[in-house]
Amino acid sequence: MIRTIKDLYAHRRLLREFVVRDLKARYVGSSMGFFWSVIFPLLNLAVYFFVFRLIMEVRFGDKMSPEASAMWMLAGITVWTAFAETVSRSTNCLVENSNLIQKVVFPSEVLPAYLTISSLINMMIGVPLVLLGVGFFIWRGEAGFVEVQTASLGAIDGQILDPGPDRTLRWGVSMLLLPFLMLAQGGFTLGIGYFLSALNLFLRDTYHLVGVLVTFWMFGTPIFYPVQMVEQARGGQFAFILKVNPMHWLIESYREVLLFGSWPQLHLIGPFVGVALLTFALGSSFFRSQKDRFPDLL
């Protein structure tokens, strides 16, 4: 893990060039350019809000307005989109850049890394949408967030946790926690990216399988519905999903910071940081152990 970090730092200029190139290439030829970073989450929100809130009538509490629930969904969609995009693109990044790996001495660990950083930057472009929505509800005096906070951030065993004044921060101060959450998210995502990109060279079907697994993972994460639906489904048979789902821990931590201006709950962010470190260590180690075989496998 340490060697990978040192290598990335040693090639930081190349890494930066790849990130800049990727950000520019995302919307090349588009008249709206980077505005798609804002529009795309809104379009996704419109689809999922229509399906889950209006058609399926998923409720987040009697006092939760449709507008407030839309902001709650948007916070989750923004984080998940960055994660899913990175995992999907990283899986096939070595194959797509085989010409670089085969012909020159190229630091291949840069490839999953620049995709991770690019997606995080793209995610941060969409974060102001959430903050603007929160500012609107504060200005309007919307109280619906209070109920969804105590409802969706309850303990995994089903007991509701009162956020309490001791955990409440001003929104401006809570924004200082975003870099920490992004760093943890980046480590977790990059670890997965390193593992899957190397595995895909041995099993080329990995890339296709990942798309299905990511979709299943998305619907198994409380992004479009409250936690209680998982805890109460079939008498609580699926409550274990919350206990083993790191993305649930991460998304709820982001919601605490973005929507409520609060500290992330320790029983959520603590395990996520541990899993992120372990995932990055294992993923980068597997990647490095197979690195010398990449040219032959390609």
Positions of predicted regions on the chain:
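Hydrophobic transmembrane alpha-helices and immediately adjacent juxtamembrane helices
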Residues: 1-298
